[in-house]
Swiss-Prot record:
ATP-binding in keyword set: yes
Protein name per Swiss-Prot or TrEMBL: Phosphoribosyl-ATP pyrophosphatase
Phylogenetic lineage: Archaea, Methanobacteriati, Methanobacteriota, Stenosarchaea group, Methanomicrobia
Keyword Ribosomal protein: no
Subcellular location, record wording: Cytoplasm
Gene that specifies this protein: hisE
Enzyme nomenclature, EC number: 3.6.1.31
Length: 104
């Protein structure tokens, strides 16, 4: 099975960072980042998409799993960007965990 091109995650994250710096009233990301509820709105979306992903898995619906997981990952990227957490930091943490698992 070929490896997926995960560079899309970097591209989406970069767009989110751009929206964070350059407000556009038409942008969904800008609306999330500047919502009156603040971080709570983003957390609501992460929670909502988590539940929808869980339900898709429970229903064993492959298409829904892909769709809802994509929504969840997108909202996680928004949450990370809002908290100044980079994908490099996440990758480094995953790499460190992977290395420690190889030693076990």
């Amino acid at each position: 099975m070929p490896d997926a091109d995960l560079s899309i995650l970097n591209r989406v994250y970069e767009i989110i960072l751009d929206r964070k710096q350059n407000y556009d009233e038409r942008s969904y990301v800008c609306k999330l980042l500047n919502h009156r509820k603040g971080m709570n709105k983003i957390l609501e979306k992460v929670g909502e998409e988590s539940i929808e992903t869980i339900l898709a898995v429970r229903n064993e619906n492959h298409e829904e799993i892909v769709s809802e997981s994509s929504d969840l990952i997108f909202h996680l990227l928004v949450m990370l960007a809002a908290n100044n957490v980079t994908l490099d930091e996440i990758a480094a943490e995953l790499s460190a965990r992977h290395e420690s698992m190889k030693r076990d």
